[in-house]
Amino acid sequence: MVSTKTQIAGFEFDNCLMNAAGVACMTIEELEEVKNSAAGTFVTKTATLDFRQGNPEPRYQDVPLGSINSMGLPNNGLDYYLDYLLDLQEKESNRTFFLSLVGMSPEETHTILKKVQESDFRGLTELNLSCPNVPGKPQIAYDFETTDRILAEVFAYFTKPLGIKLPPYFDIVHFDQAAAIFNKYPLKFVNCVNSSGNGLYIEDESVVIRPKNGFGGIGGEYIKPTALANVHAFYQRLNPQIQIIGTGGVLTGRDAFEHILCGASMVQVGTTLHKEGVSAFDRITNELKAIMVEKGYESLEDFRGKLRYID
């Protein structure tokens, strides 16, 4: 009997699939829908300290091979998600969930993380260092000096399981430099990747989203090769105790299989979940299991990270 069970930081999950932060996770109702689906767990919308409206609409557009968005971190504020998770972990103590968060400044990031540290939250925390869609705010993880400083400051007080969501990197030297920084800290996971920032999609003679004159993060099939490269590059470079969540271009079980083959311990679904709804988790899981049966694999460990090279 094949199994898609997995674990992150010692927490076990019945399935390796989950939503990506930003999709099907704004409200408790959406999170409940993911929780009750075939997904192994969920991650909340990336929370800031206070409620954010986000960027003006239209700010999301499905396009033939994926999506473009410039949402601008709309969310209901940290307390909304943290209170829900604190209640949920008492009701469903056998399951573990992810809380995504980021501050609009380094000071706010520390305020948020200290609040989580002081709470009774027992799940996994994901610090988003990679949002490309807040005007005037750079993607932190492209600035290695700032990333190093923030992680040093965070781990001076934060002792709960923490991972970071990363933007896509495109240069081998950047993989080396980023991994050298991440290996200095007790990170539990890195999430590769957020949307590929600042693409343009045009219909007729116009952009399709309003913020930033149409520039937005690209998701879906467009980014799978980049996502796989990031997953595998960090799998090769990171300490074994830093696991990898693969995100980007997961439409089918084959896509999920490739993320795991490259080294991912969990796989997030974003654009496809937005287009198809939570039934996508069932379909992708069944497709993944069919591939495993065909290849004679019984568990994810049988093929995780075992990408073959050409001599």
UniProtKB/Swiss-Prot annotation:
Domain of life: Bacteria
Pathway: Pyrimidine metabolism; UMP biosynthesis via de novo pathway
A single GO molecular function term of this UniProt record: dihydroorotate dehydrogenase (fumarate) activity
Protein name: Probable dihydroorotate dehydrogenase A (fumarate)
Gene3D superfamilies listed in its UniProt record: Aldolase class I (3.20.20.70)
Cofactor(s) needed by this chain: FMN
Residues forming the catalytic site: 131 (nucleophile)
Reaction catalysis annotation: (S)-dihydroorotate + fumarate = orotate + succinate
Similarity comment: family membership: Belongs to the dihydroorotate dehydrogenase family. Type 1 subfamily.
Quaternary data: Homodimer.
Subcellular location per the Swiss-Prot or TrEMBL entry: Cytoplasm
The gene coding this protein: pyrDA
E.C. numbers: 1.3.98.1
UniProt GO cellular component terms: cytoplasm
PANTHER family named in the record: DIHYDROOROTATE DEHYDROGENASE (FUMARATE) (PTHR48109:SF1), DIHYDROOROTATE DEHYDROGENASE (QUINONE), MITOCHONDRIAL-RELATED (PTHR48109)
UniProt keyword annotation of Oxidoreductase present: yes
Function: Catalyzes the conversion of dihydroorotate to orotate with fumarate as the electron acceptor.
SUPFAM superfamilies registered for this protein in UniProt: FMN-linked oxidoreductases
Species this protein is from: Streptococcus pneumoniae (strain ATCC BAA-255 / R6)
Family annotation (PROSITE patterns): DHODEHASE_1, DHODEHASE_2
Sequence positions that bind FMN: 45-46, 128, 165, 193, 220, 248-249, 270-271
GO biological process, one term: 'de novo' pyrimidine nucleobase biosynthetic process
CC cofactor note: Binds 1 FMN per subunit.
Cross-referenced InterPro entries: Aldolase_TIM, DHO_dehydrogenase, DHOD_1A, Dihydroorotate_DH_1, Dihydroorotate_DH_1_2, Dihydroorotate_DH_cat, Dihydroorotate_DH_CS
UniProt entry keywords in alphabetical sequence: Cytoplasm, Flavoprotein, FMN, Oxidoreductase, Pyrimidine biosynthesis
Residues annotated as binding substrate: 45, 69-73, 128, 194-195
Pfam families according to UniProt: DHO_dh (PF01180)
